[in-house]
From Swiss-Prot:
Its cofactor is [4Fe-4S] cluster. The gene is fldC. Belongs to the FldB/FldC dehydratase alpha/beta subunit family. This is (R)-phenyllactyl-CoA dehydratase beta subunit. Pfam families: HGD-D (PF06050). One of its GO terms (molecular function) is hydro-lyase activity. InterPro entries: FldB/FldC_alpha/beta. PANTHER family: 2-HYDROXYGLUTARYL-COA DEHYDRATASE, D-COMPONENT-RELATED (PTHR30548), SUBUNIT OF OXYGEN-SENSITIVE 2-HYDROXYISOCAPROYL-COA DEHYDRATASE (PTHR30548:SF5). It comes from Clostridium sporogenes.
């Protein structure tokens, strides 16, 4: 086993046993843990309060109790998250930060508040017009409300110094993860889709400084190896989440490497650093204003062009759109993105996904056919 494989196996173990690692961290540090749901929750506030931010993106749990509170056409990320909460899977959490980026998330917050009484609901309400000064001031006012809740839960005061330190820790992590994504495009034979996912997904369950250092060490091991020509196909992936190992293994079976992504669960979290400003709160407001993401207000619909440019830069042969079933923002984006891809002459395929998928044969057929056309 190579040294890099040892790192990948460590990340894999964390991904497959997240609760074990979360509980271990809590026991070792004495910190309380706060759940952070999609998308762009201000985890820096949690860290500045001396607590442990934990990513919560659903699972492949079978639905039962959540069906009482959600209609069938709510995405499986939210349905399975509520199911897990109702089943006590998140009882180690002291709070859950829930955003309002889509209609389904708005429902999620209210349902969580109603049904999960032992975990405090922390609403993260963000402005649609995030770039104007009024939007920035509104966001800061909401973050201040979040700070009050987090201080009450933790018993710690969030100071400018602690928030500044948290921002620096997160920005350093963002830089390293961006570097890792770029490295994956240069070593597609080593950083396979499943191994790439282990690194990306494990970040949600680890201390950020620890994850940053571990990814750095992994990259050093890989950089010591001479890059070899890759005989397979290179693709860019886009969507909300694509963390199913069964699905990613289908890419590997067809000799397809992921050389870049516009996945909300992956690189979209990291591509916007925090600019300098007068105060730490100003910095967070400016960062949010600078985010270019179609799940936020994006009247110019630049997502397709962004992916086209990435595909050209990383010499991708095609694009795979992993469409989360019942995700309205994604479904609205697709027609314009399809047009952008076709005008650029870049082949693409749409694969519908669901957290509860058991049979991937339809996806297998589509991916195999797509690979053969590249």
């Amino acid at each position: 086993m190579s040294n890099s494989d040892k790192f990948f196996n460590d990340f894999k173990d964390i991904v497959e046993n997240p609760k074990k690692y979360i509980m271990k961290h809590m026991e070792q540090t004495g910190q309380k843990a706060i759940g952070c749901m999609p998308l762009y929750t201000p985890e820096e506030l949690v860290l500045a309060a001396g607590m442990f931010p934990v990513g919560v993106w659903g699972s492949n749990t079978e639905l039962s109790k959540a069906k009482t509170y959600f209609p069938a056409f709510i995405c499986s990320i939210l349905q399975t998250t509520l199911e897990n909460a109702l089943n006590g899977e998140y009882d180690m959490l002291s709070g859950m930060m829930i955003t309002n980026y889509c209609d389904s998330l708005k429902c999620m917050g209210q349902n969580f508040k109603l049904t999960v009484e032992n975990i405090e609901f922390i609403p993260v309400t963000v402005p649609q017009n995030r770039k104007m000064e009024a939007g920035k001031e509104f966001l800061k006012s909401q973050y201040k409300m979040n700070i009050e809740q987090l201080e009450k839960i933790s018993g710690n005061k969030i100071t400018d110094e602690s928030l500044e330190k948290a921002i620096e820790i997160y920005d350093e992590h963002r830089k390293v993860m961006n570097d890792f994504s770029m490295l994956a495009s240069k070593y597609p034979g080593i950083i396979t889709p499943t191994k790439r996912n282990y690194v990306m997904k494990s970040a949600y369950y680890m201390d950020k400084k620890e994850h940053t250092e571990k990814v750095r060490q992994l990259m050093d091991e890989i950089k010591a190896i001479e890059p070899k020509p890759f005989e397979g196909k290179r693709v860019i992936t886009t969507g909300i989440i694509a963390d199913s190992e069964d699905l990613l293994k289908i890419l590997e079976e067809n000799n397809i490497a992921i050389v870049g992504d516009d996945i909300a669960h992956e690189s979209r979290q990291y591509r916007t650093l925090t600019p300098e400003a007068n105060t730490p709160m100003d910095r967070l407001a400016e960062q949010f204003a600078n985010r270019e993401c179609s799940t936020l207000y994006d009247p110019e619909k630049k997502r397709g062009q962004y992916i086209v440019e990435m595909a050209k830069e990383r010499k991708a042969d095609g694009i795979i759109f992993f469409m989360t079933k019942f995700c309205d923002p994604e479904e609205y984006d697709y027609p314009q993105m399809k047009k952008d891809f076709e005008e650029a002459g870049i082949p693409h395929v749409l694969i519908e996904t669901d957290m509860q998928m058991k049979n991937y044969e339809q996806a297998r057929t589509a991916i195999q056919a797509f690979s053969e056309t590249l």
